[in-house]
């Protein structure tokens, strides 16, 4: 690769880094200021990134963000990276103690994606594989990850969600969801009380990279035929201990 090609690749990667670290879509001017390159150069790189589906524009066409292709790439890397075995071991220890399915999840676009999952041995269970996606507004992990987004990004994302009813208990009103998210953030605990599937409950705790941002969530789900919500809440301290261990794998 020539020095010119190498420099162009580094600049393109730097722009992707800036977009991925931002709280929301960025304007051309904001990207120029962050990367300290001429406006024409940044605009040319952005057009190249758009043409390869690595960057997309928002509805107003004035702001840029990482595309769904980049988000899926990030998920794939995390699922296959070196610390994946350590993450799986942490989930396995939780399942051994609780006896129910445990998940490691993260936000990907307007969905929750499973980075890893250890299934219970009980025959009555939900069969989902790592890489599976579930809604944000009616899952314990989804509400938790939404709750820890910066306010503007959270408002924008909630406004874009269809808020479809998955059961009689699903929150389908944006105002009610925002109230739930405020409570979720305060208690640092996501709760799914039959909101995604009748008869299935779940709780989730954040994996915190710093005091205000959750990089992932750990959740346990169980049929109500085997456990009440009060009984499930009794395992929250175990989930929090697991989250403290899990965050170390995101720093490697």
Swiss-Prot record:
Residues 83-252 form the IclR-ED domain. GO terms for biological process: negative regulation of DNA-templated transcription. InterPro entries: GAF-like_dom_sf, HTH_MetabolicPath_Reg, Tscrpt_reg_IclR_C, Tscrpt_reg_IclR_N, WH-like_DNA-bd_sf, WH_DNA-bd_sf. Residues 28-47 bind DNA. Residues 6-68 form the HTH iclR-type domain. Signal peptide: none annotated. It comes from the Bacteria. Keywords: DNA-binding, Transcription, Transcription regulation. GO terms for molecular function: DNA binding; DNA-binding transcription factor activity. The keyword DNA-binding applies. PANTHER family: HELIX-TURN-HELIX TRANSCRIPTIONAL REGULATOR, ICLR FAMILY, HTH-TYPE TRANSCRIPTIONAL REPRESSOR ALLR. May regulate transcription of the sauSTU operon. This is Probable transcriptional regulator SauR.
